[in-house]
Design a protein with these regions (language model features):
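N-terminal amphipathic/hydrophobic targeting modules at extreme N-termini
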Residues: 10-30, 35
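Active-site-proximal region of nucleotide-activated glycan assembly enzymes
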Residues: 24, 93, 152-213
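Conserved nucleotide-sugar phosphate-binding/catalytic loop shared by glycosyltransferases and other
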Residues: 43-48, 70-116, 262-264
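Donor-nucleotide binding loops and adjacent catalytic segments primarily
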Residues: 81, 86, 90, 214-298
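An aromatic- and histidine-rich active-site surface loop
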Residues: 81-85, 135-154
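An amphipathic, basic-hydrophobic alpha-helix
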Residues: 106-135
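Acidic donor-binding loop of glycosyltransferase active sites
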Residues: 133-135, 277, 293-308
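Conserved donor-binding/catalytic loop of nucleotide-activated donor transferases
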Residues: 154, 293-295, 309-315
């Protein structure tokens, strides 16, 4: 997977230049050039809900702050999203919108969600006017739509990031409005105006960039990491529980960390205890980079962000 570094002009306008550098695992960085180092940049990153949307946004935010601690980052999300749980611990400010998804819901909930859209646009307008951003980036998720759309009509530069090969509904709509569309896969260009798109890979947080020494297999027990994304995966949880009877002869050689999500945590915990397994059961793993580095084998969903992070750690 190619690694790219992006050079933005000093006004963070609609002109971007890109240059390819060395190969690395699915990573790109927004790079403020030397001529722009003294400029204070204010950026809103909107969206989230799941780790697949949120963590690439955090990677971009970390890189802007690494370039200059005077740059300002504000996240816009929802009260129910993953962003509410973790952004404060990472030192980022978060403001929330009262907005819900529409796709895949019943008629009553769809109507309720539609009625919340005007309110979320008013909330976005107030947040943007108070913060005065140079750029608003949508990372996917419910809050991304109102915030990016509002910024567009306020003539603020906008961009979206699409991590998946098949873009979500929100990004497909926003693609018609924004100034730039940053893609992980070239195939995704078919869904957007091609002149706006740039294939850059999936942003990965700096904590996942490790040296070769930390990738060596650990001595002692075989470490197995099982997770299903930020919300857990019932199918993976059920499959692992079905496999436990076949692992009884390996118990003394095996250590498991299993991130279950909230719904299955009690059932999974009871099954591990009944089979006498050395297992740590968690709802959510904050330091995924450390979890990857300490594992010998990973069993997980093939989410775009998970694959990029796993590739970056050399697994």
């Amino acid at each position: 997977v190619r690694r790219y570094i992006r050079d933005a002009d000093t006004s963070l306008g609609s002109t971007f230049h890109i240059k390819k550098v060395d190969s690395y695992g699915g990573i790109y960085f927004f790079n403020i050039p030397e001529t722009c180092q003294g400029t204070i940049v204010k950026i809103i990153i909107a969206g989230g809900g799941t780790g697949g949307h949120l963590f690439p946004g955090i990677a971009v935010a970390e890189e802007f702050l690494r370039r200059s601690r005077e740059n300002s980052i504000l996240f816009i999300g929802t009260e129910r999203g993953l962003e509410k749980k973790i952004l404060g611990n990472l030192g980022f400010n978060l403001l929330t919108l009262d907005v819900e998804g529409i796709k895949g819901r019943g008629l009553i909930k769809k109507i309720s969600a539609l009625f919340k859209i005007p309110q979320s646009i008013v909330q976005s307008n107030r947040i943007i006017r108070d913060f005065h951003p140079n750029l608003v980036i949508g990372v996917g998720g419910y809050a991304s739509g109102p915030a990016v759309m509002t910024a567009h009509f306020m003539t603020i530069k906008t961009a979206i990031m699409e991590q998946n090969a098949l873009p979500g509904l929100t990004n497909r709509i926003l693609g018609k409005l924004v100034d730039r569309i940053f893609l992980t896969f070239a195939e995704t260009r078919a869904w957007f105006p091609e002149e706006k798109t740039m294939v850059c890979g999936n942003p990965v947080r700096a904590s996942f960039l490790v040296d070769n020494e930390s990738r060596k297999r650990r001595e002692g027990k075989f470490n197995l990491l099982i997770f299903g994304g930020s919300q857990g995966a019932h199918t993976i949880n059920r499959a692992v529980l079905g496999a436990l009877p076949y692992l009884k002869n390996m118990r003394q050689h095996l250590r498991i960390i299993h991130q279950t999500g909230e719904k299955d945590v009690n059932t999974v915990t009871e099954n591990y205890e009944r089979h006498g397994m050395d297992a740590e059961i968690v709802l959510f793993i904050i330091d995924m980079a450390r979890a990857y580095r300490s594992s010998d084998l990973l069993i997980c969903r093939a989410g775009a962000t998970s694959i990029a992070e796993i590739t970056a750690t050399g697994k």
